[in-house]
């Protein structure tokens, strides 16, 4: 199960890295989906509540699908100015390894590594957004990462937050238009 947790943690990190590097709806949705799959795999492998893990999976997938409906079309990957976010993606994973440290030998520790990496990178992205759709995608990813640090109720709350943020409109309304 440790290998499954490790695959989940890496997949979650790759997903949140995509959220961090994307500015358009497809990139955000695919990143959110990848993060969801990774965190769900890690949660199941670490022995978390099966119902909580299922709720996390459902909420993340619904949030990702809802993110496809509005915002800037396309992928929006690696736009000018995104190099610091790419560097941050690598550094955050290394920082999460140091932070989790000695508990990496067990599936729970590996799952925690993925959740910490997701939460840190999503938080960094949330603080640097320029568009509302990026903020909503990063917020949903942050909710999933923080929820994955807990058990049943935290996983369900994270799923609800991801769906709620996915349901919000990403287009800014302009007064007078």
Place the predicted regions along the sequence by residue.
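Alpha-helical transmembrane segments of multi-pass membrane proteins predominantly involved
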Residues: 1-177
């Amino acid at each position: 199960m440790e290998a499954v947790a490790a695959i989940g943690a890496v997949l979650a990190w790759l997903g949140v890295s995509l959220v961090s590097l994307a500015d358009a709806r497809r990139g955000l949705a695919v990143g959110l989906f990848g993060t969801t799959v990774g965190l769900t795999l890690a949660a199941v492998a670490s022995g978390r509540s099966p119902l909580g893990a299922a709720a996390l999976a459902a909420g993340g997938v619904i949030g990702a699908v809802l993110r496809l409906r509005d915002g800037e079309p396309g992928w929006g990957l690696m736009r000018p100015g995104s190099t610091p976010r790419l560097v941050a993606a690598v550094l955050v994973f290394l920082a999460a390894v140091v932070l989790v440290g000695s508990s990496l030998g067990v599936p729970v520790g590996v799952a925690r590594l993925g959740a910490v990496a997701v939460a840190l990178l999503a938080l960094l992205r949330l603080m640097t957004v320029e568009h509302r759709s990026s903020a909503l995608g990063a917020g949903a990813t942050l909710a999933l990462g923080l929820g994955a640090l807990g058990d049943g109720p935290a996983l369900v709350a994270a799923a609800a937050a991801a769906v709620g943020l996915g349901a919000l409109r990403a287009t800014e309304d302009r007064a007078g238009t």
